[in-house]
Amino acid sequence: MLFTIKPSFLKPVGFIQTRNLNRLYPKQRIPKRPKIPMGSKIAEVTETTSAYYNPPASSPDVRITPPVFRYDAPPIHQRDTSLSKESMFLPPAVSRKSKSKGKLRFSTHQLSSEDIKSIQDLRTKDPNAWTTGTLSKKFNTTRLLISRVCEAPKERIQKVEENFEAEKLAWGSKKREIRRQRASRQAFRTLERVAQV
């Protein structure tokens, strides 16, 4: 005996969804206002009429704003924005660091023997008070030059290292990893410099 299956009993395995799209909708859903030609009158304004102008929330446009509400800017020669001759050619100072510190002395040849002796005396007397920063400000030099002229005493170096080790205990894992990578990069650079020489 043969059984035949009618097509009406067959159900599709996958569900196919069809979209009914209306292809006739306009490209711009909201129609734009026609542009107002230049020189055309928007409204008749007399002395007796009172006008209320509510501008749109957009950048001001001279073609749309009525002449009554336009701002008459003062001429350039009347504006209070005249610059001095020095500041006309220089950009504005961004921060305190960008201000020039005067003529700094970078080498030991620029220091006199009296300056070198006084730096060494002050550094050995009180290294906590006379740091490289304070001495560089006093003698108008760089901190590197101060450290070349006179090194800090061993007790001061040991104290600074102990403070730094105490700060390291508060570091997180990310900061430790960044510092380790920086140290390895610096070591690699010094090896490269030695290899080039």
Curated annotation (Swiss-Prot):
Domain of life: Eukaryota
Subcellular localization, as worded in the UniProt entry: Mitochondrion
GO biological process: mitochondrial translation
Keywords recorded for this protein, A-Z: Mitochondrion, Ribonucleoprotein, Ribosomal protein, Transit peptide
Pfam families for the chain: MRP-L20
Organelle transit peptide: 1-20
InterPro entries xrefs: Ribosomal_mL58 (IPR024388)
GO cellular component: a single term: mitochondrion
Signal peptide feature range: none
Major localization class: mitochondrion
Gene Ontology molecular function: structural constituent of ribosome
The keyword Repeat is assigned to this record: no
SUBUNIT field: Component of the mitochondrial large ribosomal subunit (mt-LSU). Mature yeast 74S mitochondrial ribosomes consist of a small (37S) and a large (54S) subunit. The 37S small subunit contains a 15S ribosomal RNA (15S mt-rRNA) and at least 32 different proteins. The 54S large subunit contains a 21S rRNA (21S mt-rRNA) and at least 45 different proteins.
UniProt cross-references to PANTHER family, sorted A to Z: 54S RIBOSOMAL PROTEIN L20, MITOCHONDRIAL (PTHR28266), LARGE RIBOSOMAL SUBUNIT PROTEIN ML58 (PTHR28266:SF1)
Family statement: Belongs to the mitochondrion-specific ribosomal protein mL58 family.
Function: Component of the mitochondrial ribosome (mitoribosome), a dedicated translation machinery responsible for the synthesis of mitochondrial genome-encoded proteins, including at least some of the essential transmembrane subunits of the mitochondrial respiratory chain. The mitoribosomes are attached to the mitochondrial inner membrane and translation products are cotranslationally integrated into the membrane.
Protein name (Swiss-Prot/TrEMBL): Large ribosomal subunit protein mL58
Gene (UniProt): mrpl20
